[in-house]
Amino acid sequence: IDFADHFIRPNYSADLTDLNGSLGAFSSVAQAGAPQMADLVLTGRAEGSAALDVRGKLNPLATPLALDIQAKVSDLDLPPLSPYSVKYAGHGIERGKLSMDVGYKILPDGQLTASNKLVLNQLEFGDAVPGAPASLPVQLATALLADSDGVIDLDLPISGSLNDPQFSLGPIIFKAIINLIGKAITAPFTLL
């Protein structure tokens, strides 16, 4: 599968290969008050090197969407994701790899609980891109968050009600990242 995102400039594209998967039966008719969940298994590779594994249960016809899935990606090269980092941080990615282990669960009442474990290995940003919509101090943040081996280990839990009109993932993720940077900045002082 050739994935392309034409909403970002420059455009982003990714090659998904060796895809294998199955999705069990599901129904729009709720049984015993809960939507019938289908078993989901999807494996493959992204960009030829990153292993992809998604497993769990879901019902795409339920309102709100009902799911309980876990997904893992290992060793995804980050430089091809530079269009996103330029848009949101003002810097391209020179090198680095991402591994992640995430879990998302949405209950019938719309309550979302998510775990996001991200490991960034040897992440290096380039210079600020002139004219980029944003410019964040990503080199400083990377230096503060990385351990002595150049590994950044992030744990970003998320929860909230999808039925709440004020609920949005963007501010929650932004707040979690700001808290991580704040902890990284104060961490050297805890050693004194």
Where do the model's predicted regions map?
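Small-residue helix/turn framework positions
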Residues: D2-D164, G170-L192
